[in-house]
Amino acid sequence: MKDNILKRSFHHSKFENIKELVKLKEKQDVKISLAFPSLNEEKTIGKEIIIMKSELMEKYPLLDEIAVIDSGSEDETVSIAKEYGAKVFYSSDILPEYGFYKGKGENLWKSLYALDGDIIVWVDSDIENIHPKFVYGLVGALLNYPEIGYVKAFYDRPIVGKSAMQPTGGGRVTELVARPLFSLFYPELSTIIQPLSGEYAGRREILEKLPFFVGYGVEIAHLIDIAEKFGSEIIAQVDLELRIHDNQPLHSLSKMAFELTKVVLKRLEKYGKLDLNTELTDKHIMIQKKENEKVLVPTEILSVERPPMITIPEYKEKFSKEEKV
């Protein structure tokens, strides 16, 4: 195994001195942006914004901007985000000439254009136990270690039931799909504890050179692309202890597993590790029970890939202008 990312694992408490992080940020003369990709998260988005804004902008000026990148929420997500002082962007309004896909990866890709930071932090908008550590833990690793370019969060993920909480068992797709595939083809990446976690941060000069799958495949593709283009040595991980959120039902996890497997197979072929000799289907076939019989339920799951943002002329023009100012 070429690398062991466990060696670059930190506990969030190592970076809890936010005053020191602000000093490092000012010394390095960098801007830091936080983005929440969202779709119908009215129950949690307000609390997330309040906590991050009050602690990491008003009390300590660690963050330069907080934004919500929305896929077209039909609830009160957008109005709540605006009320509590976040910048709000509809993903469909960012670089509209390139079209719009509904998906988390699309929001992340578009956020690179919308946000100004040299360091970008992405945090999912459905976290029930939100805490400033979800940001300063990730940012702290980047500010303290210039050789690190991309930081993933890890944590315990309990399964929340109607009447009780199982302390472990979340992250099922990681253990059943991602880790076995990494063990086979990228063993160094199998040492990432939560490779599919939705909380991570990176340096713009890394992120802008990565393609983005528009759906759930974005995280796993990032890790493979980073390992191939930059080396896994720039990846670190931070222990945030616990993340509580609504767990996905099994049929949703099945769709996610299909998409992740397809993305990994595409990457294996791209990097010459596998020759598929076949066209991968977009149709995921599930079997469900209706009344007293089993029926096939085919679902189309596209694996659309956005190019590296650095290849987009509008992006290059915007950020070359900012560099000259």
From Swiss-Prot:
<keyword id="KW-0460">Magnesium</keyword>
<keyword id="KW-0862">Zinc</keyword>
<feature type="binding site">
    <location>
        <begin position="243"/>
        <end position="248"/>
    </location>
    <ligand>
        <name>UDP-alpha-D-glucose</name>
    </ligand>
</feature>
<keyword id="KW-0533">Nickel</keyword>
<feature type="binding site">
    <location>
        <begin position="37"/>
        <end position="41"/>
    </location>
    <ligand>
        <name>UDP-alpha-D-glucose</name>
    </ligand>
</feature>
<keyword id="KW-0479">Metal-binding</keyword>
<keyword id="KW-0170">Cobalt</keyword>
<dbReference type="Pfam" id="PF00535">
    <property type="entry name" value="Glycos_transf_2"/>
</dbReference>
<dbReference type="InterPro" id="IPR029044">
    <property type="entry name" value="Nucleotide-diphossugar_trans"/>
</dbReference>
<protein>
    <recommendedName>
        <fullName>Glucosyl-3-phosphoglycerate synthase</fullName>
        <ecNumber>2.4.1.266</ecNumber>
    </recommendedName>
</protein>
<feature type="binding site">
    <location>
        <begin position="124"/>
        <end position="125"/>
    </location>
    <ligand>
        <name>UDP-alpha-D-glucose</name>
    </ligand>
</feature>
<feature type="binding site">
    <location>
        <begin position="216"/>
        <end position="219"/>
    </location>
    <ligand>
        <name>UDP-alpha-D-glucose</name>
    </ligand>
</feature>
<keyword id="KW-0328">Glycosyltransferase</keyword>
<keyword id="KW-0464">Manganese</keyword>
<feature type="binding site">
    <location>
        <position position="247"/>
    </location>
    <ligand>
        <name>(2R)-3-phosphoglycerate</name>
    </ligand>
</feature>
<dbReference type="GO" id="GO:0046872">
    <property type="term" value="F:metal ion binding"/>
</dbReference>
<comment type="function">
    <text>Involved in the biosynthesis of the compatible solute mannosylglucosylglycerate through a phosphorylating pathway. Catalyzes the transfer of the glucose moiety from a nuleotide sugar such as UDP-alpha-D-glucose to the position 2 of 3-phospho-D-glycerate (3-PGA) to form glucosyl-3-phosphoglycerate (GPG). UDP-glucose is the preferred substrate, but it can be partially replaced by ADP-glucose.</text>
</comment>
<dbReference type="InterPro" id="IPR050256">
    <property type="entry name" value="Glycosyltransferase_2"/>
</dbReference>
<comment type="subunit">
    <text>Homodimer in solution.</text>
</comment>
<comment type="similarity">
    <text>Belongs to the glycosyltransferase 2 family.</text>
</comment>
<feature type="binding site">
    <location>
        <position position="245"/>
    </location>
    <ligand>
        <name>Mn(2+)</name>
    </ligand>
</feature>
<dbReference type="GO" id="GO:0016757">
    <property type="term" value="F:glycosyltransferase activity"/>
</dbReference>
<keyword id="KW-0808">Transferase</keyword>
<dbReference type="InterPro" id="IPR001173">
    <property type="entry name" value="Glyco_trans_2-like"/>
</dbReference>
<feature type="binding site">
    <location>
        <begin position="171"/>
        <end position="174"/>
    </location>
    <ligand>
        <name>(2R)-3-phosphoglycerate</name>
    </ligand>
</feature>
<feature type="binding site">
    <location>
        <position position="126"/>
    </location>
    <ligand>
        <name>Mn(2+)</name>
    </ligand>
</feature>
<feature type="binding site">
    <location>
        <position position="104"/>
    </location>
    <ligand>
        <name>UDP-alpha-D-glucose</name>
    </ligand>
</feature>
<feature type="binding site">
    <location>
        <position position="71"/>
    </location>
    <ligand>
        <name>UDP-alpha-D-glucose</name>
    </ligand>
</feature>
